[in-house]
Amino acid sequence: LMALATDLNEFTHFVAKPARGHGNVTGADNVVSWQTGYPFGVNFSKGYPRFNPGEFTTVDTLSRKEADAAVIIASDPVANFPKPAIEHITSDKCKLISIDTKQTPTSEAAHVSIQTSTYGINTGGTVYRMDDVPISLRPAFDSPFPSDLEVLTKLRKKVRELKNGNRCQSVSR
C-alpha cells in the first residue's frame, strides 16, 4: 500500500491512512496534538504533557495493569485491544466507565455505562474527517440522551466535589 501511495504521488497528491474506529478519532488526535504538540500516548501525571509511545498509550498502560479505572469515550477497546489490555480493563481491579452512543462489548463489560447523544446528529460541534479537514455540524434532531460534554462536565464536577470532601449521593441527568 505504501509503495502504491509513493507511485501515485508522481501524478497527484495521495496519502494512505488507516480507517478509524467509531467516534471522532481524528478529531481527538487533532485536539491532543494542538493542545500538547503530541498526537497520542500523552501522560499528564507530572502536571505537564509527556510523550512516550510504548509507555503511555492506553494499550501499554492497561497491558501493564497500571490503571485502576478507565473512562472510555466513544471507543470499543474490548472489541479491539490486545488480550492483556482487555483482561485488565474487564477485571475487578480496573473500574470501567463507558460513555458511548450505542451498546458495544465495552459498554456491556463496564461497571457504569452511560448512553449519550450522537454528535453531528443530535449535538452540534466540530468533527474532523479522516483527512484532517474540520467540519462544523448542527444537530438534525433532539435526543433523549445527554451529550458527551454534558456527561463529562457533570462527572468532573462530581470528582471535584468528592476531592474537596463534599460527598453527594448521586449524579442526576
Question: How does the language model describe each region?
Answer:
Residues 1-173:
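Non-catalytic alpha/beta scaffold blocks inside enzyme catalytic domains
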